Amino acid sequence: MRQVTIPLIQSKSMFCVIYRSSKRDQTYLYVEKKDDFSRVPEALMKGFGQPQLAMMLPLDGRKKLVNAELEKVKQALSEQGYYLQLPPPPEDLLKQHLSSVG
């Protein structure tokens, strides 16, 4: 009797590795592979500072991210090899208060 080997079909899961900036608060860099910054422009890396590992995250099956649009992250990773998440703009509490007072 002859054995038949059936190859396993492996889907390529999309992961990202997220690094925190050592120079800029609330700034994060998403890359495809751990410690691989080869596709990130040198000028960006210089301004970003020493990357500090924040987390590794699977993107497949995920519906959303906390502070970034999932589809934009996936597209940026596949097209340019990185995604830069900048901090949200600061709230102008005085302006909000003055507009609510009228």
UniProtKB/Swiss-Prot annotation:
It comes from the Bacteria. PROSITE patterns: YCGL. This is Protein YcgL. It comes from Salmonella agona (strain SL483). InterPro entries: YcgL-like_sf, YcgL_dom. Coiled coil: none annotated. Residues 14-98 form the YcgL domain. HAMAP family: UPF0745. The gene is ycgL.
